[in-house]
């Protein structure tokens, strides 16, 4: 009998600063395994082993998600949550951690989570996994990690995984998701830009997130770095969109020099705040400028699209009353946020 870590626990292991590097070098297994472990064994033996493996105290580990074969009875406890999988586990979707413990690979983890969240939330999860952050219960509300998977890898071919019920949902959720996001606001802005109009977005050319702009020797005299990263930009555009959040004023001098260096390279910066995105006239002007930079145009929305857009905005952006004067946001964390012990 083996322990197959799944769902939220698998996501946290891949993205936790305490374990992500170990998960990244774990080896795939080729053959099937016996996923018929008992709940008693998970609680008494595997949880202590997992605590030792991750360095997280047993009392802080939380409830562990794990997979069982469909024909095995599930008996959840306060310490563990069993989930069933229909049919044999697919090849090369599990990573061996030793001691008969296996971790669901990133794309398999994402497929498991497809049954828990809607398309908008799944797109946000995909961009967090393929980006550099995960919402966290820690002090800053974000935990940093290297990308654990690419969006292309999440768009798994059906032949890799079989005709599982979540495949269509995964394909739809990753259709407009992008790599390389560094924050929830970059994710929200990107999804607003390229989600189709009929789903509430603006249906514009897909942006590039955090594109590297290498500086000339002359510009490096102004801003002594090899390159700058632009938060959001259209392909081959000289207009760069920068999210202006709470942290902006902490390095004001550095950002002024950075902006001057980028201007010398021929780029123009358009700053975007959360309050602007919440204000329809300002948001539409930002989208109009993005469309123009991409060689596109902004079409007026129909009544149906307006209703869809309001619904999408409610999913992607906080309520206006939760935005603080300094740009901070009072917002509840999603169910997939990294627990504080894992941060």
Question: Residue locations for each model-derived region?
Answer:
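Short gly/ser-rich loop at a beta-strand->alpha-helix junction or flexible surface loop bordering the NTP-binding
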Residues: 1-165, 301-303, 310-343
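Surface segments flanking catalytic/ligand-binding clefts of nucleic-acid enzymes
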Residues: 147-343
């Amino acid at each position: 009998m083996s322990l197959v870590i799944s769902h939220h626990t698998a996501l946290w292991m891949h993205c936790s600063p305490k374990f992500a590097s170990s998960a990244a070098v774990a080896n795939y297994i080729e053959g099937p395994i016996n996923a018929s472990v008992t709940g008693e064994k998970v609680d008494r033996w595997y949880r202590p082993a997992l605590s030792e493996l991750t360095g997280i105290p047993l009392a802080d580990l939380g409830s562990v998600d794990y997979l069982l074969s469909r024909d095995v009875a599930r008996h959840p406890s306060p310490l563990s949550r069993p989930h069933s999988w229909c049919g044999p586990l697919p090849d090369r979707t599990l990573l061996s951690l030793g001691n008969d413990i296996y971790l669901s690979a990133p794309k398999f983890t994402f497929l498991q989570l497809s049954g828990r969240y809607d398309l908008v939330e799944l797109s946000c999860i995909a961009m967090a996994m393929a980006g550099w952050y995960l919402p966290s219960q820690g002090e800053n509300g974000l935990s940093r990690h290297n990308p654990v998977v690419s969006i292309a890898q999440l768009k798994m071919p059906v032949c890799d995984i079989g005709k599982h019920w979540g495949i269509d949902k995964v394909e739809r959720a990753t259709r407009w998701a992008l790599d390389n996001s560094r924050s929830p606001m970059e994710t929200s802005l990107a999804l607003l830009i390229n989600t189709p109009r009929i789903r509430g977005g603006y249906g514009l050319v897909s942006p590039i997130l955090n594109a590297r702009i290498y500086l000339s020797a002359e510009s490096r005299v102004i801003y002594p770095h090899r390159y700058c990263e632009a938060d959001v930009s259209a392909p081959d555009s000289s207009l760069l969109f920068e999210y202006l959040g709470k942290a902006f004023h902490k390095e004001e001098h550095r950002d002024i020099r950075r902006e001057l260096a980028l201007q010398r390279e021929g780029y123009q910066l358009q700053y975007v705040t959360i309050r602007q995105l919440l204000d329809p006239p300002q948001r539409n002007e930002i989208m109009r400028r993005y469309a123009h930079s991409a060689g596109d145009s902004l079409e007026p929305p129909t009544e149906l699209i307006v209703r869809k857009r309001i619904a999408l905005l409610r999913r992607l952006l906080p309520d206006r009353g939760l935005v603080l004067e300094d740009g901070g946001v009072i917002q509840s964390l999603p169910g997939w946020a990294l627990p504080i012990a894992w941060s």
